[in-house]
Swiss-Prot record:
Tree of life domain: Eukaryota
Subcellular location as annotated: Cytoplasm
Its EC number(s): 4.2.1.11
Active site (catalytic residues): E212, K346
Cofactor detail note: Mg(2+) is required for catalysis and for stabilizing the dimer.
Pathway: Carbohydrate degradation; glycolysis; pyruvate from D-glyceraldehyde 3-phosphate: step 4/5
Cross-referenced PANTHER family: ENOLASE
Subunit structure comment from the entry: Homodimer.
GO biological process: canonical glycolysis; glycolytic process
Protein name stated in the entry: Enolase 1-2
Length: 440
């Protein structure tokens, strides 16, 4: 049984050019690496990412303290502990106890999750199985042959782009593709059609891309964005086959009482400040007009009643992200209050693989769907592709089919599908079992 010989961390750069944590873990089988992502629109209750806050370097975004914590605290303690590399939960719990806080703010979630991911890779190598199969065994998954439907963020707004567009992400899902590889092709074709349409309608700059690879034309309303995306789907030849979802990231719009659809505008209109019932009416109108199958974070992370209200009425998938932050305590409350019917899964939100699995299993037991997610500040680490397959998640989002850090995850799913051969199952419409059939 192999043990950890050495753990080393360094500061590298993410897709936004900001520092992030890289971890290398060595056993007698070799060295196994992980790279930690970082979010821009983050939930208040996420595990704490440790930054240096030294304004003289990297604008305060350095991670030298987090790197130091891996090299001088976590690493030596794990090597000394002699915990077996295959004891994922034992290692994760050891690090959580070593941190000693409720939110990992002492050592940093970005330190702990980097080690947790590297441990998983080393354990899979020791067991001579793919990483997704290892995660599946930890999770008790029935199968690790299901490839998720990709959710491509093709048009950016909110905090991910300039302009006045309030909603953060407009996504397309090739639900009716026969395979993942075909779904990726469909998504790529719609994306390029969309980019050409945007440049034709709004000028060359409309083809510029945001943090996650989606285009960022200077739009004002959700209707403008959805019209453009829907037109691209039709022009690419996938009307009725490719569906739409969007992430409102509504905590960014909320002022404690009302939701301000003009929160980015220099000329806000009073009529665009809505209470949750009026905002739900807006969502309902959009659902009736466009082929929408899911809405993520439709309300603020503390507006529990609004989530429950919408979930009791809507016919689409309601995905909880900032509300639940991959945290079993928050998720348990959301399940009890019937706030949503799907969980967005982000491993760095909670800070360890074991806790991520716990949240995913709790959601599945409640009949919720799963969508595994990247972050806006990414690396070329493809871990979440394996996480999605291992957890039997029907859906995964990793940005547009553009920018190498986004394609790293989709390309890894292509490899997994190829390796599985005839046993590979594309989630397809089954990814939306939680969506009423009349939306498909």
């Amino acid at each position: 049984m192999t043990t950890i010989q050495k753990i080393y961390s360094r500061s590298i750069y993410d897709s936004r050019g900001n520092p992030t944590v890289e971890v290398e873990l060595t056993t007698e089988l070799g060295t196994f690496r992980s790279m930690v992502p970082s979010g821009a629109s983050t939930g208040e209750w996420e595990a704490k990412e440790l930054r240096d806050n030294d304004k003289n370097k990297w604008g305060g975004k350095g991670v030298t303290i987090a790197v130091h914590n891996v090299n001088n605290i976590i690493g030596p303690a794990l090597v000394k502990s002699d915990i077996k590399i295959t004891d994922q939960r034992g290692i994760d719990e050891f690090m959580i106890k070593l941190d000693g806080t409720n939110d990992k703010s002492k050592l940093g979630a970005n330190s702990i999750v980097g080690v947790s991911m590297a441990v998983a890779r080393a354990a899979a190598a020791f067991l001579k199985i793919p990483l997704y199969e290892y995660i599946g065994k930890l999770a008790g998954s029935k199968t690790t042959e299901c490839i998720p439907v990709p959710s491509f963020n093709v048009l950016n707004g909110g905090r991910h782009a300039g302009g006045d567009l309030a909603f953060q992400e407009f996504m397309i899902m090739p639900i009716k593709a026969p395979t993942f590889s075909e779904g990726l092709r469909w998504g790529s074709e719609v994306y390029h059609t969309l980019k050409a349409l945007a440049k034709k309608k709004y000028g060359a700059s409309a083809g510029n891309v945001g943090d996650e690879g989606g285009i960022a034309p200077d739009l004002t309303t959700a209707e403008e964005a959805l019209d453009l995306v829907n037109e691209a789907i039709k022009e690419a030849g996938y009307d009725g086959k490719v569906k739409i979802g969007f992430d409102v990231a509504a905590s960014e719009l909320y002022n404690g009482k009302l939701y301000d659809l003009d929160f980015k505008s220099e000329h806000p209109k009073p009529e665009n400040k809505l209470d949750y019932k009026k905002l739900y009416e807006k969502y309902s109108a959009l659902i009736e007009k466009y082929p929408i199958v899911f809405i993520e974070d439709p309300f603020s992370e503390e507006d529990w009643g609004a989530f429950s209200y919408m979930s009791s009425k809507t016919k689409v998938e309601v995905i909880a992200d900032d509300l639940t932050v991959t945290n079993v305590k928050r998720l348990s409350k959301a399940i009890e209050l019937k706030c949503a019917n799907a969980l967005l899964v982000k491993i760095n939100q909670i800070g360890s693989l074991s806790e991520t699995i716990d949240a995913a299993n709790m959601a599945k037991k409640a009949g919720w769907g799963l969508m595994v997610s990247h972050r806006s500040g990414e690396t070329d680490d493809s871990f979440i592709a394996h996480l999605a397959v291992g957890l039997e998640a029907g859906q995964m989002k990793s940005g547009a089919p553009c920018r190498s850090e986004r394609l790293a995850k989709y390309n890894e799913l292509l490899r997994i599908e190829d390796n599985l051969g005839d046993s590979a199952i594309y989630a397809g419409t089954r990814a939306a079992d939680y969506i009423k059939s009349n939306t498909l």
